Amino acid sequence: MTENDNEVVEVVDDDEAVVSESPVDVDTATEAEADTETDESNETTPTASDAAGDETTTQTGNESADAEPDDELEGPTFDEDVMPDEEADLLIPVEDYLSAGVHIGTQQKTSDMERFIHRVRDDGLYVLDVSQTDSRIRTAANFLANYNPDQMLVTSSRQYGRFPAKKFADAVGARARTGRFIPGTLTNPDYAGYIEPDVVVVTDPIGDAQAVKEAITVGIPVIAMCDSNNQTSNTDLVVPTNNKGRRALSVVYWLLANETLDRRGADSLYALDEFEAEI
C-alpha cells in the first residue's frame, strides 16, 4: 500500500470521467447477495453520454454529477406508499426515510432497477421500495465488515455525496476520494495517488463511472447507491436509493456507517446530523 490509513482526498475539479472501453464482467463470487446483472443490453459501464442512446432507459440532465436536485423534491409526504409490507422491520422508522426523500427516484427507470421500484407516482416519479433500501444497507454492512478498514474506498463526485462519503470513511476507517476521480488511481502504479483497495463504494455509477471502470479493471467488487435511472451491470451490490438528494445521501451513509461498525462489534456513536452536508 502507498497511502496512509483513513485518508481523505478531495479533488475540486468536477469534470465527468467518461467510460468508453468495452465492458468487463465483474466476479461476484465474493458476496452471496451480489447483484451483477447479465442482461446483454446493459453490458457497458454507465455514463451520461452512453445513456442518451440506451434502449432500456431515457436519461436526462439530472444524471450530471453537478446537477443536484433541490431539497423540495424530498417533501414530507410521511404517509406515502413506499413498500409492499407496511409492517416491515426497518433500521429507522419509515417516516425518517420519507422525510429524507430516500424513496424518491427519477422520472426514468432502467430494466436493471425495475425490481427495486415499488410504484410510479402521479407526477411521473418512480418510488423506490424503502424496505429493499433498508435490507441492502444491512447486506452492504455485512459485506464491508469482512474487509480491513484501510482496504475500503468510498467515492463521490456528486456535490451532496462528498461530505457524507468522507464522514463515512472517517467513521469506519476507510479511504475517500471525492470530487473528480483521477484516472489511474486504481490502475497506474506510477501515479502519486495510486492505491490498492479491496472494495469500492460509489455514490452514483454514472458520476463515479471512472472509479467503477477501474474497479472492474483490477477485479475488485463495487457497492453502488443506485437510483431508478441507473444501470447496474458493473455493480456487485446495489443499494437502491435517491442518490442525488442531500438528506437522502446523508441518511444512507449514516446508516451504512453505523451498521458496519455494529457488525465489527464497535460502538456506533454517530448522529445523523453529523453526516448532513450543508446547502
Swiss-Prot record:
Q: Where is the composition biased (Acidic residues)?
A: 1-18, 28-42, 65-81
Q: Which GO terms describe its molecular function?
A: structural constituent of ribosome
Q: Has keyword Ribonucleoprotein?
A: yes
Keywords on record: Ribonucleoprotein, Ribosomal protein
Read off the SUPFAM superfamilies from this record: Ribosomal protein S2 (SSF52313)
Q: Which CDD domains match?
A: RPS2 (cd01425)
Q: Does the keyword Transport apply?
A: no
**Record region (Disordered):** 1-81
One cellular component term from this protein's GO annotations in UniProt: small ribosomal subunit
Report the family membership. Answer: Belongs to the universal ribosomal protein uS2 family.
Annotated protein name in UniProt: Small ribosomal subunit protein uS2
The species is Haloquadratum walsbyi (strain DSM 16790 / HBSQ001)
Its organism's taxonomic lineage begins at: Archaea, Methanobacteriati, Methanobacteriota, Stenosarchaea group, Halobacteria
